[in-house]
């Protein structure tokens, strides 16, 4: 009769050992794998107008959620609209000049140039004949040297006028020179470039959100006169959300780009976020003071950037995160 309690006692001991062993195995499986500590890293960007001017309106305020493509603010457009009108007029003038160069001269202009040559030729012939007569009179001492010189000057002037008229007629008949056409084309292209710049300036007097995010600061108010590039808003980008962590050389082989990990925060200790290693620094550095593990603080470590694939609004800049490696994380 005494054997039965002994058997029961042995069974209890064995059962307790099995339970303890199972618990130990479960805990070892839970703790198996590398564990790192890091912080949430959300990028911020300063938004500004590329051009300067007076702030006409701002459409958002601090704390507002913004969407990519949303209009955030506008400068006074009037100066840029006037500048655009001016350069458009310049393009029209340059285009007309270029077209004129390509078209050459009209028949009426050529006819007028030919008539001018005939007139200049007649004037030259008369001046030449008069000079010849004056030479004869000079030889007979009938006129003074001054009279002969005046006749020569008149002949030379008529000759120059004739040559100018002939050159003009030749140009009209052959059309504009290639160099003149090229110069007119270059002037047109310069005017078109100024037009493109004026259109861009007008476009950039409206501030557009480049991506989704949350407005952190609003640095100016309507009526402020800004220089180009002056900060108007600071925005926290919604995506991507990263975790910055550090790994020592001993465990570096486990932290390869593409490796999936689990990310735990104090607010969600039982419901991890999912992440994937996107970048591993190629150079070692001393561990930053923010790293919570004392045994790493004096080591050389490598920086990791882990992309949170299921991030939500609960993740905030600088929030501490535990990075859990393991078979479950690596093969999800």
From Swiss-Prot:
Principal localisation: periplasm
InterPro entries membership: CusB_D23, UPF0194_membrane_YbhG, UPF0194_transport
SUPFAM superfamilies per UniProt: HlyD-like secretion proteins, Outer membrane efflux proteins (OEP)
Superkingdom per UniProt: Bacteria
Family from the record: Belongs to the UPF0194 family.
Protein known as: UPF0194 membrane protein YbhG
Location of the protein in the cell: Periplasm
Coiled coil (UniProt feature): 108-209
Keywords carried by this UniProt record: Coiled coil, Periplasm, Signal
Signal peptide: 1-16
Cellular component annotations (GO), alphabetically ordered: periplasmic space
UniProt keyword Coiled coil present: yes
